[in-house]
Amino acid sequence: MVEPFLGTWKLVSSENFEDYMKELGVNFAARNMAGLVKPTVTISVDGKMMTIRTESSFQDTKISFKLGEEFDETTADNRKVKSTITLENGSMIHVQKWLGKETTIKRKIVDEKMVVECKMNNIVSTRIYEKV
């Protein structure tokens, strides 16, 4: 059920995001810039197609996809990845794979907030968004 995720969300807190970006291989300058911004995320659905648009003063990104189907994604840090997004137990699970590496971005709704857990290897970052 995607309905709880739909709408526009603003980042209100972030924990361990720089370490996560470092694990991804994001360079120092880009990590510093990305760490300062408070992005707005809009999640929408049109039929079977979902869209996640992320907007910030650093960079805007947009992905459109069908749940459970692999798609090509260029990330904000310019990685070319194969992504798959699924719904599992009330969470939206976004898996990115590239060059033998993998990261998982898990979105879930907790107390009307969107909690985003970004994990790569043993590094976990938690980012919390409130609905606008």
Curated annotation (Swiss-Prot):
CDD domains: FABP9
A Pfam family it matches: Lipocalin
Keyword tags: Cytoplasm, Lipid-binding, Phosphoprotein, Transport
Main location: cytoplasm
One example of a Gene Ontology biological process annotation: long-chain fatty acid transport
Record's subcellular location: Cytoplasm
Residues where Phosphoserine is found: 13-14, 44, 91
One GO CC term on file: nucleus
PROSITE patterns: FABP (PS00214)
InterPro entries: Calycin (IPR012674), Fatty_acid-bd (IPR000463), ILBP (IPR031259), Lipocln_cytosolic_FA-bd_dom (IPR000566)
GO terms, molecular function: long-chain fatty acid binding
Homology family: Belongs to the calycin superfamily. Fatty-acid binding protein (FABP) family.
Record-linked PANTHER family: FATTY ACID BINDING PROTEIN (PTHR11955)
Protein name: Fatty acid-binding protein 9
Record organism: Homo sapiens (Human)
Gene (name only): FABP9
